[in-house]
Swiss-Prot record:
Main subcellular location of this protein, as a coarse class: nucleus
Name the UniProt record assigns to this protein: Transcription factor AP-4
Key word Ribosomal protein present: no
GO biological process: one example: cellular response to dexamethasone stimulus
Residue list for modification Phosphoserine: S123, S124, S139
Phylogenetic placement of the source organism: Eukaryota, Metazoa, Chordata, Craniata, Vertebrata
Function: Transcription factor that activates both viral and cellular genes by binding to the symmetrical DNA sequence 5'-CAGCTG-3'.
Amino acid sequence: MEYFMVPTQKVPSLQHFRKTEKEVIGGLCSLANIPLTPETQRDQERRIRREIANSNERRRMQSINAGFQSLKTLIPHTDGEKLSKAAILQQTAEYIFSLEQEKTRLLQQNTQLKRFIQELSGSSPKRRRAEDKDEGIGSPDIWEDEKAEDLRREMIELRQQLDKERSVRMMLEEQVRSLEAHMYPEKLKVIAQQVQLQQQQEQVRLLHQEKLEREQQQLRTQLLPPPAPTHHPTVIVPAPPPPPSHHINVVTMGPSSVINSVSTSRQNLDTIVQAIQHIEGTQEKQELEEEQRRAVIVKPVRSCPEAPTSDTASDSEASDSDAMDQSREEPSGDGELP
């Protein structure tokens, strides 16, 4: 009877074959949309997890290899020399140690040089100043010149900085305005309307002021005396008795304050009207005076001054003693009223 011994190395190969067979079956079932058994589903999940782990491990190894390559470029080595990862790490550690030693040595040298410079330049500035003073009074002060130059340079730099800041600020303001114009067009419209309203109000106010000034000028021109009659026969006629003539004569003889203030001018007008009514007396008397005035205008220029005397004489006979006094005062020019 013969016995066949199965070697132990073939057992894992059979297990591996069975696993691969199950994976293939699971993949075919997933492709054919066939419901999987629980065992095949577990195998498929394991396969997916294994693939994910393999990809992560691959990435990790790639990053490690890249780090070793960068270290290899940093450390001193000959071109074409092949170095393992352990050799690269060892050489980098040695290189870092040597760099630290070099750093400490340079720091010690730097401190020694600083001390040497301080020892040499400890009393030198005082000696130099004393020597400069001993040389002569008219020697130029170098320190002041250097300070002045430094100040000038600082001023120039500050001006340049200010110009740059101004240009930047103007650019930013323009950008802000453009953004506001894009984002808030309604706000700009409201502002424009407000500006237009303000301009309209200002125009109305100016027109009102101009109107008031024109009215004041008209009042002043009305209150001013007429030009002195010289050559025209119709203008040479003395102040006629009707109300307008008396009004003009009395106001011109009044003070300057009467022309300036409106209230005083009104009071003067009232008093003038009362005086004129008192002088005229009755309506019949006015008609007679108008006829006499027409007769005076028709006469030549030489007979004009005689007309008021005859008129006043006829008026004095018909009027009272008080009215006659007032009529004499007015042609003579003394027409001031209380």
